UniProtKB/Swiss-Prot annotation:
Glycans are attached at residues 173, 239, 264, 305, 315, 358, 554, 653. N-glycosylated. It comes from Drosophila melanogaster (Fruit fly). Optimum pH is 7-7.5 at 35 degrees Celsius. Binds 1 zinc ion per subunit. Its cofactor is Zn(2+). This is Neprilysin-2. Disulfide bonds join 84-89, 107-759, 115-719, 171-424, 646-771. GO terms for biological process: protein processing; proteolysis; sperm competition. Disruption phenotype: RNAi-mediated knockdown in females mated to wild-type males results in laying of fewer eggs due to impaired sperm retention and increased sperm displacement by rival ejaculates. Females also show a reduced hatch rate and only 20% of their progeny reach the adult stage. Unhatched eggs are fertilized but contain a clear polar body rosette instead of an embryo, suggesting that the eggs activate and complete meiosis but then embryogenesis is arrested. Detected in the stellate cells in the main segment and the bar-shaped cells in the initial segment of male and female Malpighian tubules (at protein level). Expressed in the spermatheca (at protein level). Expressed in the somatic cyst cells of the testes, with increased expression at the tail end of elongating cysts. Expressed in the ovaries with strong expression in the posterior polar cells and in border cells of stage 8, 9, and 10 follicles. In adults and third-instar larvae, expressed in the brain, ventral ganglion, and stellate cells. Residues 1-20 are cytoplasmic. It is a single-pass type II membrane protein.
């Protein structure tokens, strides 16, 4: 249930639309107050293009699961007398109407129909690269987190609740940050051997420098270890109860998709200019910086060119290549592997002779040896030190941050830096993915504990779990109905489906002070040392992750699911689990006090999406226990791949107008399969709920059937506006289709959508040829 802050002065908090709808009571077509009246009058005078009679549903009595209405249900959802006039229904109607453009024919472009006014009237703030249904909730959540973090916490309070406050204060101390200038990073860099570009000819005078030793020093100091070789502790894909060392291709500062194009790509040019300008701010000679950093950039381009593209990394079996230390040494002798790995592991952990190490992309390591052999040490060192200096810029004084903003503008279109308090809230609550495993969330666990205690209603867990079970049952029945699966594969799919663990809201352990105290025992933050404290957090997180190497994987570990204050949802192939944090169980996505068609169209869609991820092109590679295993009969797999190919080609043929770019059907196929399956499953689940509980009332001012409103809620889930630069990046590097195509692609494949809106066969939203995986 959405958190509602009680306020006796309720009327003053209503907007004009809500006041008008309330005063009008049962009147479906209302006239709003000045400023909004003409627009809404137009909306309310415009009948939907088709107004079919809804299917009669069983039962007309109000149950505890139904929203109370202003009039008794007559048992026919198309009856305009059934209107919900509660406070929450009026607010919901207002929100829906502000986004819709009902004069658009839904069978032509449902995204414009559901989100057209939102797209025309909403403006992207200068400090953002996009706005969306998600960002509205995230902004509200950010303000709630600010209140939590800025609250005074005396020394008597547990340390784990004071740590976020200390980091926030360090971040907000702009006076000290400006006074220090570049000193925080230059002091550390000098201790690490110095940036050759800055040190000049005195660098490496004894010719003893090696990139391996530099990586070890970076690890000790709290920087990333992944600039040459990505080193992490992961889960054994074929035995997900064990952990192992995972070696992968290097982490790049600019996406591979851009770097491989060289200077033909404008963003590569922007990146190069940024490198040079930042180096000059640190004291480098500009001409020398241009020369030396060009060589370093060419080295990074070479790293990109020997790396695998995302399209090739979707097959997990291709990324699973176990080697012993001896095999590594024989194949890639340019690194003393045992010494290298031991130096990166925490004290007390050492690589055994029979240790099985996963080499994600063997061809990368073969090519890397050749690249390193022909690249001068100074070029490699300049590149590595550029990376840590580039990482540090956001923690430094304003002259550095202004140049960073210019680069961000080229990259994503952002026009201004966000308010300092927003940045500091994010720093104090978010994980650093660059150096920490996914199950480490810096101070987000501490802040999340305070957040759920103050803002999350426990009833929301039960409501969401009920929907999960209903939608899971629908997927089970879909498996029964598909005619392209053999019986054995279908049985395994059902077993995987019903074994899928569900994590909703937050783990109870988050509220246990003893567990929190133990988790944060080794972490300290100095409010007068912002950058150093952040590096300390990185060391803490890396040690936490690496110390798990010899420990069995606990798939229900509370720490892995202790990220409640985010607006997102997750599926884990290795856990075979779905997760819905507290942050998404509110706002557009869920409210127990509004009609169910709105909840099924929003959070129900998300639930179905995450369940379906277990059976998308990547999730299907893992079995019921989360192990990488081929459990598909060859004929069934062939049929699946043909269906997935239809999705790939459908989305790959979409062209985004603003950028002129075609979508990447391969990289987005997993999300697209999940969208298509998720909305179908949730729709069927809603129809079953309605058959059991009877018809639901309409929302005031919205003369649509409950089924049509389900689709409106689903479409408005993806209302979003992007800056052109951000959209280009999303299409080029992302796994999600732009919002417009998430709606058009999935709903145009739905026969029920076409039926509910009476779309003629062959219309844009009811093509003759449809794609369907599940």
């Amino acid at each position: 249930m959405q958190t509602v802050i009680q306020n006796p002065n309720w009327w003053r908090r209503r907007n004009k639309l809500e006041k008008s709808l309330l005063v009008s009571l049962g009147i479906m077509f209302v006239v709003l107050a000045t400023g909004f009246g003409l627009w809404i009058g137009k909306v309310l005078r415009t009948s939907p293009p088709s107004n079919p009679q809804a299917t009669a549903l069983h039962g007309d009595s109000t149950t505890i699961n139904q929203v109370p209405t202003g009039t008794a249900s007559k048992g026919k959802s198309g009856d305009s007398g059934d209107v919900c006039l509660t406070q929450e229904c009026i607010h919901t109607a207002s929100t829906v109407l502000r986004k819709m453009k009902p004069e658009v024919e839904p069978c032509d472009n449902f995204y414009e129909f559901a989100c057209g006014t939102y797209l025309e009237e909403e403006n992207i703030p200068d400090d953002k690269v996009s706005i969306s249904t998600f960002s509205v909730i995230s902004d509200k959540l950010q303000e709630q987190l600010k209140d939590i973090i800025t609250a005074e916490r005396p020394e008597t309070e547990p340390k784990h609740f004071r740590l976020p406050n200390l980091l926030y204060k360090a971040c907000m101390n702009k006076t000290l940050i400006e006074t220090l200038g570049p000193e925080p990073i230059t002091r550390v860099a000098e201790r690490l051997g110095g940036w050759p570009l800055i040190k000049g000819d005195s660098w490496n005078a004894d010719d003893s420098w090696t990139w391996q030793e530099q990586v070890k020093k970076f690890r000790t100091a709290g920087f990333s270890m992944d600039y040459i070789i990505d080193f992490s502790i992961g889960v054994d894909l074929q035995n997900s109860t064990k952990r192992l060392i995972d070696l992968d291709q290097s982490s790049l500062a600019l996406s591979r998709e851009y770097l491989v194009k060289g200077f033909n790509e404008t963003l590569v040019t922007a990146y190069y200019k940024y490198m040079v300008d930042i180096a000059v701010l640190f004291g480098a000679n500009r001409d020398l910086a241009k020369t030396e950093l060009l060589l370093s950039l060419e080295f990074e381009m070479a790293l990109a060119n020997i790396s695998w593209p995302n399209e090739k990394r979707r097959n997990s079996s291709e990324l699973y290549n176990l080697r012993t230390p001896a095999q590594l040494q024989a194949a890639y002798p340019y690194v003393q592997w045992v010494d290298y790995m031991n130096a990166l592991l925490p004290e007390g952990l050492n690589v055994a002779e029979d240790e099985m190490i996963n080499l994600s992309v063997p061809s990368f390591f073969e090519d890397l040896g050749k690249l390193l052999a022909k690249t001068p040490k100074r070029v490699i060192a300049n590149y590595m030190f550029w990376r840590i200096h580039g990482f540090s810029v956001g923690f430094l004084s304003e002259e550095f941050r202004k140049r960073q903003l210019q680069y961000a503008t080229a990259l994503s279109g952002r026009q201004e830096q966000e308010a300092r308090w927003k940045e500091c809230v994010d720093i104090a609550t978010s994980s650093m993915d660059e150096v920490c495993e996914d199950d480490f969330d810096s101070l987000g666990i501490s802040v999340g504990s305070l957040y759920v205690g103050k803002h999350f209603h426990k009833d929301s867990k039960a409501n969401a779990l009920e929907m999960v079970n209903e939608i899971r049952n629908v997927f089970n029945d879909i498996l029964d109905e598909v005619n392209w699966m053999d019986a054995k594969t279908k049985k395994e799919a059902k077993l995987k489906l019903h074994s899928m663990a569900t994590h909703i809201g937050y783990p109870d352990e988050m509220l246990d002070n003893e567990k929190l105290a133990a988790y944060y025992a080794k972490l300290d933050i100095d409010p007068d040392k912002y950058f150093e404290s952040f590096l300390g957090m990185n060391i803490f997180g890396t040690d936490y992750s690496f110390n798990k190497l010899r420990l069995p994987v606990n798939k229900t570990d509370w720490v892995r699911h202790a990220r409640p204050a985010i607006v997102n949802a997750f599926y884990s192939s290795l856990e075979n689990s779905i997760q819905f944090p507290a942050g998404i169980l509110q706002g557009h996505f869920f409210n127990a006090q509004r009609p169910k068609y709105m909840n099924f169209g929003a959070i129900g869609y998300v639930i179905g999406h995450e369940i379906t991820h277990g059976f998308d092109d990547q999730g299907r590679q893992f079995d019921v226990k989360g192990n990488l295993r081929d459990w598909w009969h060859p004929d069934t797999q062939k049929a699946y791949l043909a269906k997935a190919k239809c999705i790939i080609e459908q989305y790959g043929n979409y062209t985004e107008r603003a950028t002129g770019l075609n979508l990447n059907g391969i990289n987005t196929q997993g999300e697209n399969i999940a969208d298509n399956g998720g909305v179908k499953e949730s729709y069927i689940a809603y129809r079953r709920w309605a058959e059991k509980h009877g018809p639901e009332a309409k929302l005031p001012g919205l003369d649509y059937t409950p089924e049509q409103m389900f689709w409106v809620a689903a479409g408005q889930t993806w209302c979003a506006k992007y800056r052109k630069e951000s959209l280009k990046m999303r299409i080029t590097t992302g796994v999600h289709s732009p919002s417009e195509f998430r709606v058009l692609g999935s709903l145009s494949n739905m026969k029920d959508f076409a039926k509910d809106f009476h779309c003629p066969e062959g219309s844009p939203m009811n093509p003759v040829q449809k794609c369907e995986v599940w």
